[in-house]
Amino acid sequence: MTSLALLLIGFSLFSAVVLALSHFRPANYVSQPGARAMGLLLLAALTGLQITHFAWLHLDLPWIDSMAYRILLFSVAPAFFMFSEPLLTPAADQPKPLLMCCHLAPALIAPWLPAAIALPLAFVIGALYLLWLT
């Protein structure tokens, strides 16, 4: 099972590079540079998580217990929301940029959360963001 996980990690890493170079070109997001930036941030966070999973599974490094891992984990849901929201919402209904800064809160509190609380809480926050988008 570990071999399959490592194979999928490699696939997702190469897919992230292909997406970053092909889909997230400036020409594709002329009127939405914020969505492009959040998409690239989302890819970077997911890439960081996958590298951490590789280090844990293959190299036996305890990076999944690190503060950086928790920050990455808590940055995925807000980055996905801030990438998707401008694409799904008409420009007149979009929140002000200052209000969008509130979405940084999960990543900012992540370093101070113990791992036993942080991991389930990150998934709860992600689920709440998905409900918000629907």
Regions found by a protein language model. Give the residues of each.
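N-terminal low-complexity or simple alpha-helical regulatory segments
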Residues: 1-134
